[in-house]
Structure formats: C-alpha cells, structure tokens
Amino acid sequence: MTEEIDFILESTEESMNGSIAHLEKEFLNIRAGKASPAMLGGVFVDYYGSATPLSQVSKISVPDARTITLQPFEKNMLQAIEKAILIANIGFNPMNNGDVIIISVPPLTEERRRDLAKQAKSEAEDAKIGIRNVRKDANTDIKKLEKEGTSEDICKSAEEEVQNLTNTYIKKIDELLAAKEAEIMKV
C-alpha cells in the first residue's frame, strides 16, 4: 500500500483508540455502588473566578465503602465545594460539619441501577457514532486518493481494512458496555 493509505489507516486507528479511551473515562464517572474519588472527577469548584477540579482544592479520601470525605485546603472553600457538588447533580447530598465535607454514598436502588445502565448505553452509543464518523472520514480520504490516481484495488483493500478496524472497535465498545452493565447491576 502507499504511504498515504498507511497514514490514513494509522490515523484512523489512533482516532478509534481515542474514542475507546474517552468511553473508558466516561464509564469511570458512572458509579457502581462503592465509594471512590473518581465519582467526583467531573465536579468543578468556582475558585477565585475560575472553574477548578475538586481534587485541586481539597483532599479527597474514602474512609469506607459508603463514605467520601473532602478536606478543603482553605476553610473558606467549604460552601463553594458543597454548592459545586449539589450543582453537579451526581446524586450526592454533601454534609458540611465546619471542617470537612462528608458525602454518604447511598446504596443503589434497582431504578437507579437501570438509569445508570441506560446512561452507560448512551455513552457507548456515542462512542460507536464517533467510530463510524472516523470510518466515514477515512473512506472519504481513500476515495479522494483513488480520484488522484491511486489503484482501485489498493483503495478497496484499504476500505476493507478500515471496515475491519471499525468492526474490531465496535466489538470492543460492546464488550466494555457489557462489563459496565454487569458491574452496575451487581447487587
């Protein structure tokens, strides 16, 4: 195959890997019962006018499977942190005792588990759409090369290779989704 085709295939695989990495990151934000600092990964606090990740303004610890504690580096940040957690709408009700913020992680109800599974499916579908868009872009680039004089056979085999990559990554997404759903539904 030509250098251009090799480049298209490499960048296609790289982009598809990026979609998988993004999906894995999104799945980390979907909690499945046990308390973890990652549950607060998407929470940003207004810190002197700029949105700052919670982990940069407080020490996050998990003393047991149902509790997360936040020790702000500055006491005056307690209200801002509490407000940010409520605004993030992640299903937590923070308690401020004047020194630390304590979050009790409630056990998941069957309804909440179904909602989380639905959210995981939605994230997986978004990742699949991303993979298909990468495939479409790669095939467009290959067609462009064909019009510029690259052999039709080379272009056809490149398109088949792109389709094989697409199938592989879609299968990987389905496997990640099945694992996440099993984790969510496990009582």
Swiss-Prot record:
Annotated signal sequence range: none
SUPFAM superfamilies, alphabetized: Ribosome recycling factor, RRF
Pfam families in the record: RRF
Cited HAMAP family: RRF (MF_00040)
Keyword Protein biosynthesis assigned: yes
Organism of origin: Flavobacterium johnsoniae (strain ATCC 17061 / DSM 2064 / JCM 8514 / BCRC 14874 / CCUG 350202 / NBRC 14942 / NCIMB 11054 / UW101)
Protein name per its UniProtKB record: Ribosome-recycling factor
Domain of life (superkingdom): Bacteria
Molecular function GO terms recorded: ribosomal large subunit binding
CDD domains per UniProt: RRF
